[in-house]
Swiss-Prot record:
It comes from Synechococcus elongatus (strain ATCC 33912 / PCC 7942 / FACHB-805). Belongs to the bacterial ribosomal protein bL21 family. Keywords: Ribonucleoprotein, Ribosomal protein, RNA-binding, rRNA-binding. This is Large ribosomal subunit protein bL21. InterPro entries: bL21-like, bL21-like_sf, Ribosomal_bL21, Ribosomal_bL21_CS. Part of the 50S ribosomal subunit. Contacts protein L20. It comes from the Bacteria. Pfam families: Ribosomal_L21p (PF00829). Transmembrane segments: none annotated. This protein binds to 23S rRNA in the presence of protein L20.
Amino acid sequence: MAYAIIEASGKQLWVEPGRFYDLDRLDADLDQSLTLDKVLLVQDEGAPQIGQPYVAGATVQVTVLSHPRGRKVTVYKMKPKKKTRKKQGHRQDLTRVLVESITVGGKVLTANAADLPKSEADIDAAG
């Protein structure tokens, strides 16, 4: 099982080829292909390659699937014995990306054909 740990949107993510992930909103169009080069670790076969801080020559190729919004978070503040109440809601803008491949040292790591989703309906059903 090939995987990489990347830094994207200020967070570290464990990513595998053929799977999709929700990141904070990226400035990219739908079906646009992006290359993420902040790769902290790559594991394929044998010992993992650990970067200091990033693995040299390692990239992760992703495709933008959609720009959904996250679940609503409700923030409620009140002061007891006073008539002070404040209720706010927030929904985070997200970008759903599909990891196409991981490239390290000229070697391209992709998912098996059986692991890839067949259609957009399969992607929506999984997430």
